[in-house]
Amino acid sequence: MDYKTKKNSNATVDIKLTFEASDIEKAFDKTYEEKQKNVKIPGFRPGKAPLNMVKRHLGDSVASDAINTLIVDGMTSILSKLEHPMIRFPKFEIQDYQPGKNLIATAIYETNPEITLGKYKKIKIKLPEVSVSDLDVSEEVEKVRKNLARKQLKEEGQAAVAGDIIDMEYTVCEKGQESKNSGNTSNDYHLGHENNLKGFDENLYGMKSGEKKDFVHTFPEDYSQNEVAGKTFEYSVTIKALYANILPAVDDDLASEFDGSESLNVLKDKIRKNLKEGFEDRVKNKKLDEIYKEIIDDSKYVFPESYLREESEHVFHNMIHEFKLPHMTMEKYANMVQKDLKEVQESFQKLAETRLKHYFTRQKIAEIENISYSEQDFDADLEKLASSYQISLSDLKKELEKGKLMEQYRENFFAKKIDNILFDLVEKKYTDKLNIGQIKDYLNQKEEVKA
């Protein structure tokens, strides 16, 4: 067999296979031998007829199978020799076939994506330095106090104030409408909590245990739940129990109760360290997004059509799963959102292309920088994760294997290793020192990557 290839510009390769008479004869013989096991010929038990009789009996009826064997065996023999590796077996077309003489078959196969990276080592970035203030630490200590708070039943006759906890029964209906429920119960309702409905708790302040109160409340026009936005509701509330929320003192006992720290200062040092490391990671991730964007903008990518098609389907089905939509085709989804199918396909292909660019950029950097990820690396990362969950490494592995998540975690850890090395390679210039509040504002801003 002889073969010729020609590389195309779209991550495909033209291939031409030319088989001689001896190649064809071998393929037919191999096919006859396979058929011999099951062929039925009068006078012989199944599979026992002589091969020459099987050949006469089957004749050219095995031509299709023989040609398929010819091509598959031929391709298998040259796979390791191909200059441009094949990522999947293509469909061949027979261009010329003269039985007993020669056969010519052609195909177009897809090869690996082609990535030409920009100069990622010359990227310059500006980033703030995380500076944890005493106030930042104090706010975290206050959260610890709230987590360890205990409730204490208030004395009879005492009124509800912000910070108290109440158990209540209530009925509610839209103003002018008849109530559709006999009553609701809400226990451990924290008065004045930042997540409570704005303006609602003011109606409850001053109430006492056992007291009943009727009032109306109007939801804001821009309320997140459209079915109640801008509407007025009538409430009838009865306080069943009223508690004071007792916060522990800020002392060594607080530290010991929270995580076993030997003193308040030790706890504060832990908080400061965790805040600094946590927000430094968040700043790094923000900058990595910008770094990858610049690398991608400065790089060239050629993806096989099958990669884009399959990744588009993957992105689409992930979206369906994430939003808990019923299983459907992209065409049905386009009808549901009242958009042209081509527009929907292009939008998902764009997302797919972005994902592929990120993935292969990371892989290309790993290849150039000779970054590997060993089984020892994986165990070390899993050990850290297990420690953070306060479970054993073996228990964590069991859970990951149970959920079929082992390879996903391996890939994520490897990606993080590549990201860390990339971050070390770029030129960094630290600007202002920002406290945690300022860092949070910074993280919500969009920023150009270049210095």
UniProtKB/Swiss-Prot annotation:
InterPro entries: PPIase_dom_sf (IPR046357), PPIase_FKBP_dom (IPR001179), Trig_fac (IPR005215), Trigger_fac_C (IPR008880), Trigger_fac_C_sf (IPR037041), Trigger_fac_ribosome-bd_bac (IPR008881), Trigger_fac_ribosome-bd_sf (IPR036611), Trigger_fact/SurA_dom_sf (IPR027304). The gene is tig. The lineage of its organism: Bacteria, Pseudomonadati, Spirochaetota, Spirochaetia, Leptospirales. Its EC number is 5.2.1.8. Its main location: cytoplasm. One of its GO terms (cellular component) is cytoplasm. Transmembrane segments: none annotated. Residues 163-248 form the PPIase FKBP-type domain. It catalyses: [protein]-peptidylproline (omega=180) = [protein]-peptidylproline (omega=0). It holds the Pfam family Trigger_N. GO terms for molecular function: peptidyl-prolyl cis-trans isomerase activity; protein folding chaperone; ribosome binding. Belongs to the FKBP-type PPIase family. Tig subfamily. This is Trigger factor. It is found in: Cytoplasm. It comes from Leptospira interrogans serogroup Icterohaemorrhagiae serovar Lai (strain 56601). It is an enzyme of class 5 (isomerase).
